Amino acid sequence: MGKFSISHLVKFGEQKHLYRLLKYGEIYMKNIDFYREYELSNPEHLRGDIYECFNNISQHNTIKFLDSDLEINNVTVYENNNTYTGYLFCMYAIFTDNENKGLDSRMLDFGEYAVIILNPKEFIYRIKEYGKANHLFPNCSPVMYFNENYHSGTLHPFMKREKYSYQSEARIYIHNSNPLDYLCFNIGSIEDIAILKRLDYKSQSNTEFLTTSDNRQ
């Protein structure tokens, strides 16, 4: 995470869930399939992504069908061979060079409360230490966003389509070849490096969002 200069990480959600994150360091990770299925049932909500963690994208001028005269022009093809299976924990990342950028109001769709992690390096360190002790091997990084109309090549769990860029996401990915619906573990209280607050969306910049008084619960 170092070269990306993340100053804060933010987890949006319901108060009861975020309290557990703050108080116990509860890391609740959803199966990748949750996000794929969510878009199918909620296409208007950008919380889900039908192409989540697919492994390749390619652009084609024309696709012709065998034994048919049918042709389709300008086609984008996504491929998934289940290279990436497992769990995701998603957060909003605030970078040192965009603290004056406005906080997108669509983030309210993720919940009316937020845990603001004031020391991202320490937070990730604690997760990695837990992972080492429990053979989980978490990978942590900001998400790279790509233009799906032009990009071709391999994909990985830290790449998403450009339409999701307002989420400014950093995520934790843990591989598991036979994942359950979710993975949940505790790293211990993070009250020393984080605060819980209720959101107030009044065209706040990231700086205003971070400096307004917290609402510890």
Task: Please give the residue ranges for each predicted region.
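NAD-dependent ADP-ribosyltransferases
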Residues: 1-217
